[in-house]
């Protein structure tokens, strides 16, 4: 059964969509999308799990605060903290694209809080300042494509190398899913994560595009996530 619950963090309201019961799995979507992108995966997993899909600020049914500070990585991580603390037991984070970066950032800055992490078509950011600025410049050029206000799209910008610098220290079990037909930068990032993280496993899904969890590979991804969670200690 699908249940909607609003969580408030420092006057910021976050819509969450909850299904099922059991060991919790929290889903974090990418920029310009919403919790609905995980509907198929969450519905399948809700047979044995509590699934919680989050609308980030300014996305889906979560209002868009006027304060630009709501659209920073640290604010997003604080939002996740409140959602995770509302659960009865530690969760597994599943994040796509920007959501995957946030899941990695959470594991990097809050060791031991979550049971595991699953990332789909994402990367850990950039250590090279020039690469970061190149990413940020491209993000700014393409803001209009994401269908969100400029202040909301600020969430996609990179400002430091916190995640890159701490990859080797992330002891949290991590499943890295990459679409075989997504852009090469994501397959490169997936390989990098598997090499640098102490407990990461890479799976490449043939024919999968950037949003493969929404349609073509939803059932396969749900099975991979279920098996991953079942294997956690």
In which residue ranges do the predicted regions lie?
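Catalytic histidine-centered segment of alpha/beta-hydrolase-like enzymes
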Residues: 208-219
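Active-site nucleophile elbow and catalytic-triad environment of alpha/beta-hydrolase enzymes
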Residues: 151-166
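Short beta-strand/loop motif that positions the catalytic acidic residue
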Residues: 170, 176-178
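Acidic catalytic loop of the alpha/beta-hydrolase fold
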Residues: 181-185, 211
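Active-site loop/oxyanion-hole signature of alpha/beta-hydrolase fold enzymes
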Residues: 43, 53-92, 219-223
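Flexible "cap/lid" loop of the alpha/beta hydrolase fold
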Residues: 101-108, 113-143
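Short alpha-helix in the alpha/beta-hydrolase fold that links the catalytic acid
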Residues: 172, 186-194
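Conserved HGGG/HGGXW glycine-rich cap/lid loop of the alpha/beta-hydrolase fold
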Residues: 12-63
